[in-house]
Every structure is written in C-alpha cells, then in structure tokens.
C-alpha cells in the first residue's frame, strides 16, 4: 500500500485504486477518507457525485465533514452533502481546536440546546437573506411559505425586522411562528 506521485494509490498487490474509497488514519488517530476516480487519480478540491450522493474533497483530497466552503454548505458525519431542513449547531459555535471540524453532536442524542434550523437548497447551499444590506434578517420562500433567516442562515421565530431602512417602523416587522412560518 503506497502513494504514487501524491495523487494515486496502489494496494499491497500493486494494483492502482480506481472508483474506490480509501480510509486512512492520520497522525492523531483520526480517520480520513479519500476517493479515487476512474482514472485512478485522487479527487481533490471539488464536489464529486458518488452513488447518487454528493461529497466535497479538500485540496489534499480528504473528504470534508461539517460546515464547509465559508460555512455555506454542510456535510454530515458520513460526508454526504445535506439538503432541506437540518437542525444543527451554528458554524461559529463549533469547537475549532483542530484544523478540521468534526460534527460529533450529530446523531449523538444530545439535547437541542444550541441547535438551530437551517435550510439547504437542492444544490446544498444554505439559505441566507437574499440582500445582505437588508439588515440582520431576511425572508425566503420555501414550499409556498415564508421563513425568516438571520445572516448566518439560522431560522428565526417571533417578531423580526425584515426590511432595511434607517427608521424602525412597525411596517418593517413580520411575525414568524414556532414552526418558522410567517403568520
């Protein structure tokens, strides 16, 4: 088992890996996953669809986990890009003791404390207000209903000022129920 030119990997029989996953252990004892395409070259610095699921690989070819690409996308502990509604710890609240983020809370049965609802489109991109100049909050229409999101993409409830302006007028506010839907 050995790397060739830092882009290819051969097994103990000298056979190059093609269309296969490779699981290695780093110096800290953590697992790292790599994927090798049909040419045998390691996939790096891109999204790759494998068995109808999307994965992202960093510049070194490692499959990425958690919040990635400026916190606009999220991949689970299995590395699969998430879409739709996801209840997650916001990216700023992650433990950043290492250079990579591992979402240890996912599926752990931990309480909901500190988790917020985020919505990811079919392309995997997190919904945030359309206009960053509109203030702290903005609305997005999902399945015919309006929801409010803050600049980090966390769904909001209660009264929110969703319009920009120098004056704080009541017309600028909308109410969002516990389910996040505009009322």
What label would you give each PLM region?
Residues 1-183:
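Extracellular adhesion/carbohydrate-binding repeat motifs centered on closely spaced tryptophans
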């Amino acid at each position: 088992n050995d790397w060739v030119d830092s882009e290819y990997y051969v097994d103990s029989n000298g056979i190059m890996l093609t269309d296969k996953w490779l699981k290695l252990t780093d110096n800290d004892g953590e697992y790292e996953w790599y994927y090798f395409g049909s040419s045998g070259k390691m996939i790096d610095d891109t999204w790759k669809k494998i068995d109808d699921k999307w994965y992202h690989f960093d510049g070194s070819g490692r499959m990425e986990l958690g919040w990635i690409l400026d916190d606009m996308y999220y991949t689970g502990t299995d590395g699969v890009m998430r879409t739709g509604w996801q209840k997650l710890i916001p990216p700023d609240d992650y433990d950043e003791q290492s250079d990579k983020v591992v979402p240890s809370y996912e599926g752990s049965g931990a309480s909901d404390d500190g988790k917020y609802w985020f919505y990811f489109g079919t392309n995997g991109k997190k919904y945030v207000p359309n206009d960053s100049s509109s203030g702290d909050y903005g609305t997005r229409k999902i399945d015919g209903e309006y929801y409010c999101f803050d600049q980090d993409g966390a769904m909001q409830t209660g009264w929110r000022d969703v319009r920009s302006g120098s004056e704080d007028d009541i017309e600028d506010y909308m109410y969002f129920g516990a389910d996040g839907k505009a009322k």
